[in-house]
């Protein structure tokens, strides 16, 4: 199998991994769905169907999650893909065990502190968002394989199969916000058009595929087929060599050494209590779990329900609590592999009480006035 087979998809994988950080939110409010058996939820019905297929084949939740994620990388490539990474939280109903898997992207070994600054020390516009310097060493394939290796039930090839079919046979573009909005945002549109591999995949002679048309990604199908046979091919085999070659030709930083040394990390979930419930979430380097608990602690015993839907006082309290969490995030949150993060102080009820006392219910404080709290810096 020649390296050249993967060059186009390698280029597209990493170019698309830095596009479309956000999605257009829907204002539609629907009632929650419930089931007594199992449920798969994702950003696209085709992704959810891939997960359901695993459950129908007597697979478990891990099989469904892995199949869904691979399928999403085909049908929603601008929001998730094998060129990216992720965080995963897993709960075992049988044992009560909570596990957190960190398979986020890692900075390449050649990355430097000032790589996004010019000679005058000013930020280089869009360099950290678009292009090869914006890309970090991907973790999705390694993370999904690690998860499946430990907890999956069906064969690895089986869980990758739906994604391969979607890539090889194509799928009809839906009215999902991703595809509907793609040709509209000029900056994103031009970024794709400027990349030969992305242009060849997502346009027909420079015109973007429209909802209702079929998109086929055969090169991605070949890559996924290789991953199904041996996921390590992505990090040490032909796919890795194609990625490293493409990076070198386009002033990117990822090397074979970066890919070879990548390993996902199992971490301990961050947990706390909110009223009668135990809340667990992703720990650092994710900031979400710590600050979710911090926000809930600040809200405390305030009866938001009695205030009514969208009551100004309820919205005000939640907004001010979020401002406080984000102010703390700017100073205290980071990657625990490199810095000490004061998790326990940030999520402590005593600290939340102090911060709650800084909220004035009759005045919205501008974000610039909300300062980080005074806690022990540099450790727990």
Where are the regions a protein language model picked out?
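Bacterial N-terminal signal peptides
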Residues: 11-22
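Noncatalytic scaffold domains of N-terminal-nucleophile
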Residues: 27-49, 53, 61-229, 234-236, ...
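M16/insulysin-pitrilysin zinc metalloprotease superfamily fold
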Residues: 193, 289-305
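Internal maturation/activation junctions in enzymes
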Residues: 302-380
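Short helix-capping/linker segments at secondary-structure and domain boundaries
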Residues: 149-154, 231-233, 299-306, 329-333
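Bacterial N-terminal signal peptides that target proteins for export
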Residues: 1-13
